[in-house]
Amino acid sequence: MKVIEKILEAAGDGRTAFSFEYFPPKTEEGVENLFERMDRMVAHGPSFCDITWGAGGSTADLTLEIANRMQNMVCVETMMHLTCTNMPVEKIDHALETIKSNGIQNVLALRGDPPHGQDKFVQVEGGFACALDLVQHIRAKYGDYFGITVAGYPEAHPDAIQGEGGATLEAYSNDLAYLKRKVDAGADLIVTQLFYDTDIFLKFVNDCRQIGITCPIVPGIMPINNYKGFLRMTGFCKTKIPSEITAALDPIKDNEEAVRQYGIHLGTEMCKKILATGIKTLHLYTLNMDKSAIGILMNLGLIEESKVSRPLPWRPATNVFRVKEDVRPIFWANRPKSYLKRTLGWDQYPHGRWGDSRNPSYGALTDHQFTRPRGRGKKLQEEWAVPLKSVEDISERFTNFCQGKLTSSPWSELDGLQPETKIIDDQLVNINQKGFLTINSQPAVNGEKSDSPTVGWGGPGGYVYQKAYLEFFCAKEKLDQLIEKIKAFPSLTYIAVNKDGETFSNISPNAVNAVTWGVFPGKEIIQPTVVDHASFMVWKDEAFEIWTRGWGCMFPEGDSSRELLEKVQKTYYLVSLVDNDYVQGDLFAAFKI
């Protein structure tokens, strides 16, 4: 979806939209840390995020890779910067074709900074001289496919600013006229350079309107995180610093936390003044840090740390090819990125009903399913790489996770238990202590309001429902006892399978069972998660593989702990259990063995 469409949609709904900007880190570890931070920030619902191109085109390949992951794994509408620096037309087209094939529809077209070691921009042979050329090229070659954003400079482009007096009136007017040419050439959105004098920005908006620029103009807000960085950035961009800001910073410039808190306060006040004029979108330059940007949005009441809205129980895809997808199997609830990778490239994605458009061709398991960000891998190593002498020791790990003593699990890409799981955490602890090792669960829900902070999704005004669900590993003797007990509970349905594919079940192999649904005004019933026998058979391979490639690999070859995990992998069963009575059912009654 185009960013301009999301901004106009938010304005039509009376909502204030916000967005975050990131830059490509220099190290692999930095990239993984950025994605962990980005995941947390995107949970707050930005309309889009953008990723910069890098000075002189120095990060072109990394920018393309990060943009792809943002759009298709983080599932946030992504806008990629594209510059003319060191970019002949064929490289520009390669970048555009790449993001188009990855389902990205948004570009921020820039001239770009001079290459490293140079003071002035020089047009590369076979390339473009300015952002206007780039906008014209994109529109001429790709028509209306891309949403094109361009930069606006409230104090004029830095090249037009001479000394501390700022740009001359003539230079400022020429810069405005050039901005209008970019919009007339096909740009549909303007995001501004950073500024700290709000009156200058508001005058800039008015001046744009006076010369016929009608598209939305989004203020670029850069929170002050530290004093030296603030001076470096404002010096590079030739940004005016109001005297009151200098006076406020001078006494605290050596106190980094005090500077950050002042930056949050200043950013909040700037945004309040801007929003009061009727502007309904804010763009936050994060510098790859989260605290200041999140602090400003919280102060403005645009987000709540304890109440993150969810359009669906899982984060919807933003890729243009799967944007209508609204049904998924529940099995990957704690491993959403693995699901995205294994379903990448489907011709169709389920919309409305799983059975109508499902594609059974899941991607094969690869190392990607079992690689983790370095920080998460370290946490797993600390919490799960402990000596294991018996299955009771294994059970203790699962129990500790359900009790919140551990914050990671080899079977989850998420941090700790999800809020809704805490409704049943006592029961989960009980059955894990009995040797039923849970990896996925949800409580029964009967008509909770859709804005409930624990189980809500889909926005206000609706009601949500859930069937109680459990997924766990257990030994064969425990499975036999459980199956016998289930016979007394007609509302319970199950599928049990071991690593080799030996299956026990009381449902048809063709059955598809909706386990989550929502009722909203003026809409058909939405059924976003299902239990599907065929998909469970695909998921079981991944789930069993985690015993060795996700946990056992933490121990050396021949280690007794590793051998114990391998034995469990070969002998245990993976069980999917649903209580179809979401009103009076008791899923855990069957475990009173």
Swiss-Prot record:
Catalytic activity of the protein: (6S)-5-methyl-5,6,7,8-tetrahydrofolate + NAD(+) = (6R)-5,10-methylene-5,6,7,8-tetrahydrofolate + NADH + H(+)
Keywords attached to this entry: FAD, Flavoprotein, NAD, Oxidoreductase
GO biological process, one term: methionine biosynthetic process
Alphabetical list of Gene3D superfamilies matching this protein: 3.20.20.220
CDD domains the record matches: MTHFR
GO molecular function: FAD binding; methylenetetrahydrofolate reductase (NAD(P)H) activity; methylenetetrahydrofolate reductase (NADH) activity
Family assignment from sequence similarity: Belongs to the methylenetetrahydrofolate reductase family.
Quaternary context: Homodimer.
Protein's UniProt name: Methylenetetrahydrofolate reductase (NADH) 1
Classification of source organism: Eukaryota, Viridiplantae, Streptophyta, Embryophyta, Tracheophyta
